Amino acid sequence: MKANIHPEYHKIKVVMTDGTEYETFSTWGTEGQVMNLDIDSKSHPAWTGGNQQLMDRGGRLSKFNKRFGGLGL
């Protein structure tokens, strides 16, 4: 393997949608940074089997529905 080509691997804190926190190692962010999840295995319909409403962060879902909601598929 070549030296000095791999990203830094450090410990971060992950906060799930229900507030559960855990620490893991990642190349994301910097040492000690917190990653807040918008959706995870406890809230995603693919894993819960439900038909839950998705959280609209940043208005993206609203913008999509406004643009394509009238198609009636």
From Swiss-Prot:
GO terms for molecular function: rRNA binding; structural constituent of ribosome. Pfam families: Ribosomal_L31. It comes from the Bacteria. GO terms for cellular component: ribonucleoprotein complex; ribosome. GO terms for biological process: translation. Keywords: Ribonucleoprotein, Ribosomal protein, RNA-binding, rRNA-binding. InterPro entries: Ribosomal_bL28/bL31-like_sf, Ribosomal_bL31, Ribosomal_bL31_A, Ribosomal_bL31_sf. SUPFAM superfamilies: L28p-like. Transmembrane segments: none annotated. Belongs to the bacterial ribosomal protein bL31 family. Type A subfamily. HAMAP family: Ribosomal_bL31_1. Binds the 23S rRNA. Part of the 50S ribosomal subunit. This is Large ribosomal subunit protein bL31. The lineage of its organism: Bacteria, Pseudomonadati, Pseudomonadota, Alphaproteobacteria, Hyphomicrobiales. The gene is rpmE.
